[in-house]
Amino acid sequence: MADQNERAFQKQFGVNLNRKVKPGITKKKLLRRSRDVGLGFKTPREAIDGTYIDKKCPWTGDVRIRGRILTGVVRKAKMQRTIVIRRDYLHFVRKYSRFEKRHRNMSVHCSPVFRDVEHGDIVTIGECRPLSKTVRFNVLKVSKGQGAKKSFKKY
């Protein structure tokens, strides 16, 4: 069962907690629902076997991934289930026929599947419906960062 540390009872949408168990089927398997987000991303083991409840998770919640798939570097991971990533890009200045470096910070929902997301990790994110005022993307994959290199990285 999920950790009940919120005021409201935490329960996964679409799962009946009072369902009768037939012989040969474990009750734990009936109390969890997970799905495949598609687009070549595998469902993490933690999403299938875990006990967390997150309605904004792309594997166990009611959020669909559609639209853009982007990458970025984690800048901050201080919020609960939300991280800030930095996306670097080059902007062309016609007057000087040169490129200039620019960046954009984005708030991204990070499911409890990815427990050990740290500053400097490279994340792949997918677009979904607006989850809050500033969050419109969900983390789909985490790769460990290279360490201390130059801050600007073009993807």
UniProtKB/Swiss-Prot annotation:
Q: Name one GO molecular function term.
A: structural constituent of ribosome
GO annotations under biological process? cytoplasmic translation
Provide the positions where the record notes the PTM N-acetylalanine.
A2
What CDD domains has UniProt attached to this entry? Ribosomal_uS17 (cd00364)
SUPFAM superfamilies registered for this protein in UniProt: Nucleic acid-binding proteins
Under the heading NCBIfam families, the entry gives: uS17_arch
Q: Which family does it belong to?
A: Belongs to the universal ribosomal protein uS17 family.
Q: What is this protein called?
A: Small ribosomal subunit protein uS17
Please name the source species. Answer: Drosophila melanogaster (Fruit fly)
User: From which lineage does this chain's organism come?
Assistant: Eukaryota, Metazoa, Ecdysozoa, Arthropoda, Hexapoda
Gene transcribed to yield this protein: RpS11
